[in-house]
Regions:
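Hydrophobic/aromatic-rich, well-ordered segments within soluble, folded domains that form packed cores
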Residues: 31-51
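Helix-rich interaction surfaces within compact, conserved domain-sized segments
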Residues: 67-121
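Extracellular structured ligand-interaction cores
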Residues: 28, 39, 56
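Acidic, aromatic-enriched beta-alpha/helix-loop junctions
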Residues: 44-83
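N-terminal domain-onset segments
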Residues: 1-36, 133
Length: 134
């Protein structure tokens, strides 16, 4: 499976690294990559195409341990070159909702969002859903 499509290339142009700073859990998800044989999920929110054709990507990297998962950088070439059992490769999630934010992507993947990110997200969600009587 090709990890980067023309559609993803356009999204990386729209969301270069740094473009969603400060949004935390509300950052728009561009892509989700995963290890089909076990742990390893990368939920990508930003990325830059490098001169050599590789992509530097930023997002939530979860390697099977909620306590050790973190926002960070990963290179496309690193994901493409991971040696998995049975000759399998890292795959792109074809069924991730298109207009999904980071918290929604974590929840649909079964990842527990970190408390610092979830608290801010839920506060904003509650403020967005408040009924005002005038």
């Amino acid at each position: 499976m090709k990890l980067i499509t023309k559609e993803l290339e356009k999204l990386f142009e729209k969301y270069p690294i740094g473009s969603q700073d400060g949004l935390a859990g509300k950052a728009k998800v561009i892509a989700k990559f995963f290890n089909p044989t076990g742990v390893g999920t990368w939920i990508i929110t930003e990325g830059n195409k490098l001169e050599n054709g590789d992509y530097e990507m930023f997002g939530y990297c979860h390697l099977g341990d909620d306590e050790m998962a973190e926002l960070g950088y990963v290179m496309l070439s690193e994901l493409e070159n991971l040696k998995l059992p049975f000759g399998l490769k890292v795959e792109r999630d074809l069924y991730m909702p298109k207009d999904c934010d980071l918290i929604q992507a974590m929840k649909t993947t079964g990842i527990t969002p970190p408390s610092y990110m979830l608290e801010d997200y839920e506060k904003e969600q509650n403020n967005d859903n408040m009924d005002y009587d005038y």
